[in-house]
C-alpha cells in the first residue's frame, strides 16, 4: 500500500534542491511559529516569531539555537536532533522506501529509528510535498511540526546558513 504515492514523493524529492516554508511547531501545550529555509543536504535556517527572536541554524553536522534578544547561542550535534532524518535527501528517500505507509488526509511515512523512536513524516496527497512530521523527544514530549511550503527551488544565498561564532 502506498507504493504509487511513495514513488511520486521520491520523484518530487529528486527534483528539489531547497524549499521555503512557514511552520507551526507544537510541543505539548507550547506552540511556536515561524519560517524556514531548507536546502539539501543538511542546511536549515528557521526564524521563530517569538519575543526572544529565536533562530535555529543547521549546517552539516551542527545545530545552533540562538535567542537574539539575549544574545545566547547553544550548539548541539545534529545527531541529537529529530531533524537529521529529514535534512538529508538520500536519507529521507531511504526512509520512504523502507518504511510502512498509512494514508489518511496525508501520506504518512512511519519511521522507527535504531533507538526505537517513532517519527511520522507527512506528505500532502495533492502535490506530494513535505507537510510536516510528528516525533517524540528524549523526554517523550510529542513534537508536531506542520509546514506550509511557500516556494521550491528559489535562489538562496548560502550565507544564511552560516553558524554563529562560538563564545
Q: Model-derived features: where do they sit?
A:
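Solvent-exposed strand-loop boundary residues in beta-sheet-rich modules
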Residues: 27-29, 69-71, 139
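A short, Trp-centered hydrophobic/proline-enriched beta-strand micro-motif
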Residues: 11-31
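Extreme N-terminal tail/first-helix region
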Residues: 1-15
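Low-complexity, acidic/polar, glycine-enriched regions of mature
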Residues: 9, 17-20, 69, 79
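An acidic-aromatic
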Residues: 36-85, 143
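Gly/Pro-enriched, hydrophobic low-complexity segments
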Residues: 91-167
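Short hydrophobic/aromatic-rich beta-strand segments that constitute the beta-sheet cores
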Residues: 21-23, 44-48, 63-66, 109, ...
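Flexible, surface-exposed loop/linker segments and immediately adjacent secondary-structure boundaries
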Residues: 69-107
